[in-house]
Amino acid sequence: MALLRPVLFERKTKMIMSNVPTGGRRVANLPLGKLLSTPGAVEALAKAGQSGAELIERHRHGDWGEVSATDWAANDRALTDGERIVSAYSLKNGVKIWIISEANREVTTLLLPDEY
């Protein structure tokens, strides 16, 4: 298992669903718990000249990125069922980053797919 590092901040929130217009879909305010990142994800973000903050915000608000329609629907169900949520995003240099919020919402981790 790769060494995990805390990133950005630690925040615990309650999940809130909002009817804010966003193309017809509700926006999640997913509780993230403690934010962690693997060394590979930290390095990939640095090489791409990007921060993980934008990706984390997309994940937190229900934009699951580049996942299949089946996985997108599973993530949407997980908001109410309390299951794990997995998002996938491509960095500017094409490297893929996954963000996983555990079912108990105590930890959200940024990692490379091969670090899973």
What function would you assign to each model-found segment?
Residues 12-14, 34, 47, 92, ...:
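Context-gated lysine
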Residues 21-86:
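Compact soluble domain cores
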